[in-house]
């Protein structure tokens, strides 16, 4: 199967692709190249960097913001800004607190502590942005340029963590609501029933959104993970561990892209020695990931940045784009 044939599209529904791997293997290069190829093929495409390092703007040589920025025809890009995400998430918490005048942020924090194992607010803020894009059908395809493997696996585990946490929060909120009704006559600051109901509805809507994201993420017809590796042992072993973790989260990993493969060079003894070692590692990769489609991208003579260079990489990986 050709690597480009791994991408599946359902009319009216967004396809989601995660591109991940060890730090330094070229995830951003592959993400940007893939996004450009999809856009040239006529797909309305969004590429999102979830990596705080934010090298997507450097790769595309464009200024990219926290909200979708148009890069070329059909192509939009986002670099999630952790500080802005945190501000937006804290604003949501403030709004929840305002639902009940008797419950300030301190009491809201008490609720979070009571729920036990509440996720870190920075991670929850990042996940809040992630949810926003996982539950959209505005684009034909959304490509996630992910952080190094460990951070990505944590993010992908968040639907399960947040679903459990929000479920506990709903339970506690209902208990508080019952107490408020019981003591309302003597404790008027507990807030009215309409405010309580609205706060509960917000939590239930969040839980519904999380469940929708979980359903999409575990659907191989809509979501897939492409692993980027380089032909070195450390990268191979980390990718193998990541593949096993992805199975745990029911995320379909179907492709492996081997980046930075050395070309043949008969006049360079050092290059030939490195190439020989790489060929051994390539054989290892094909054996370990025999159930995946494996593609190779050669090491370039210059830096892999700029739209023209990225389009050439995409053509090596996927062939000429075929506009719809």
From Swiss-Prot:
GO terms for molecular function: ATP binding; ATP hydrolysis activity; ATPase-coupled arsenite transmembrane transporter activity. Gene3D superfamilies: P-loop containing nucleotide triphosphate hydrolases (3.40.50.300). ATP binds at residues 21-28. It catalyses: arsenite(in) + ATP + H2O = arsenite(out) + ADP + phosphate + H(+). Keywords: Arsenical resistance, ATP-binding, Nucleotide-binding, Translocase. Its EC number is 7.3.2.7. CDD domains: ArsA (cd02035). It comes from the Archaea. Belongs to the arsA ATPase family. NCBIfam families: GET3_arsA_TRC40. Anion-transporting ATPase. Catalyzes the extrusion of arsenite. This is Putative arsenical pump-driving ATPase.
